Curated annotation (Swiss-Prot):
GO terms for biological process: bacterial-type flagellum-dependent cell motility; regulation of bacterial-type flagellum-dependent cell motility by regulation of motor speed. The keyword Chloroplast does not apply. Acts as a flagellar brake, regulating swimming and swarming in a bis-(3'-5') cyclic diguanylic acid (c-di-GMP)-dependent manner. Binds 1 c-di-GMP dimer per subunit. Increasing levels of c-di-GMP lead to decreased motility. Monomer. Interacts with the flagellar basal bodies. Residues 128-232 form the PilZ domain. It comes from Thioalkalivibrio sulfidiphilus (strain HL-EbGR7). This is Flagellar brake protein YcgR. It is found in: Bacterial flagellum basal body. GO terms for cellular component: bacterial-type flagellum basal body. The gene is ycgR. Keywords: Bacterial flagellum, c-di-GMP, Nucleotide-binding.
Length: 246
């Protein structure tokens, strides 16, 4: 199974999935893309708490069935039964999507459980690219190092991040101009990797002995965008785990 973590959207994100795919051919195209891309889905059993990981194993377009891999962790499989509805969350073209499947069969193949259900009648998704913001927890120190146009280097702490940009806390004596272009020499991600790119300062203001900046990415390579997406998912997953403990 793909190791990239799946995560359900926050209520704000889920509420913004106001576009619908209802045409059968388009639904099949989306599901096939998720299956071929080995997209990891986050699954929630209706009327139950908790989220589990699964993937699409097979799409039977002729008979109109969808087959899902065994839920992980294992306690998810123990909770599922025929007649229940699985709500599934994932990404299609890097945009969040949601659909539901009624489980009509629970089977096993080579020691691994699977679930079958009819094709969903609707897929909800965000049609336009949305920059969902993930926040960096206080216990996690992710650094960002910027180089200004005059060559000065300034390092600070990453506070939030999205596919569109980031927020950071910089030293109190930092000076930034709105619309100033800076080089992001290193922006640390939760997986200990760092990306480099260019960014435009959108705003800056003093706060609690620091300077908070908001920046928009201006040049972001496809590989860096994929790394960012994975980082955002991981940060949201950590926040969900924290909320469940609280």
């Amino acid at each position: 199974m793909n190791e990239t973590p799946a995560v359900p959207p926050s209520p704000e994100v889920e509420g913004s999935l106001n576009e619908q795919i209802s045409h059968r051919r388009r639904i099949l195209a989306v599901l096939d893309a998720m299956k071929d891309g080995r997209a990891l889905l986050s699954a929630r059993i209706e009327n139950q708490r908790g989220y589990f990981n699964t993937t699409l194993l097979k799409i039977d377009a002729e008979k109109g069935y969808v087959f899902l891999d065994e839920l992980a962790p294992a306690d998810g499989h123990e909770k599922i039964a025929v007649g229940q509805t699985l709500h599934l969350y994932g990404f299609y073209n890097n945009l969040p999507a949601h659909f539901a499947i009624e489980v009509i069969h629970v089977g096993e193949h080579e020691g691994i459980a699977f679930y079958a259900g009819p094709l969903p009648k609707l897929i909800h998704y965000q049609q336009k690219r949305a920059h969902f913001r993930a926040y960096v927890g206080l216990g996690k120190e992710l650094k960002v190092r910027l180089r200004k146009g005059d060559g000065a280097q300034i390092s600070g702490r990453l506070q939030d991040i999205s596919l569109g940009g980031f927020g950071a806390l910089m030293p109190a004596d930092s000076v930034f101009e709105d619309l100033e272009i800076v080089e992001v020499e290193a922006l640390e991600l939760p997986d200990h990797h760092a990306i480099a790119c260019s960014a435009e300062i959108r705003h800056s203001h003093p706060t609690q002995g620091r300077v908070h900046i908001g920046a928009r990415f201006t040049q972001l390579a496809p590989q860096a965008e994929r790394q960012l997406l994975q980082a955002i998912v991981e940060l949201e997953r950590e926040q969900l785990r924290k909320q469940s403990r609280d």
